[in-house]
């Protein structure tokens, strides 16, 4: 059924997502970075991820 195929697609997408290490998606504050989008939270300053102000 259509319901089944939708569930299968979702499952595949989930499996693909979990295979990636977290580091490829974002990096924690204090870790070296090149672009802000690499950081889990906050901007990339002086080559390192800094926590966003709300985290302090």
Swiss-Prot record:
Keyword Kinase: no
Tissue distribution of the protein: Expressed by the venom duct.
Keywords: Disulfide bond, Ion channel impairing toxin, Knottin, Neurotoxin, Secreted, Signal, Toxin
Highest rank taxon of the organism: Eukaryota
Secreted in keyword set: yes
N-terminal signal peptide: 1-2
Subcellular location: Secreted
This protein's GO CC annotations: extracellular region
Entry GO MF terms: ion channel regulator activity; toxin activity
Propeptide: 3-25
Intrachain S-S bonds: 26-40, 33-44, 39-49
Chief place where the protein resides: secreted
Description of its domains: The presence of a 'disulfide through disulfide knot' structurally defines this protein as a knottin. The cysteine framework is VI/VII (C-C-CC-C-C).
Family: Belongs to the conotoxin O1 superfamily.
Protein name (database record): Conotoxin Bu12
Organism: Conus bullatus
Lineage of the organism: Eukaryota, Metazoa, Spiralia, Lophotrochozoa, Mollusca
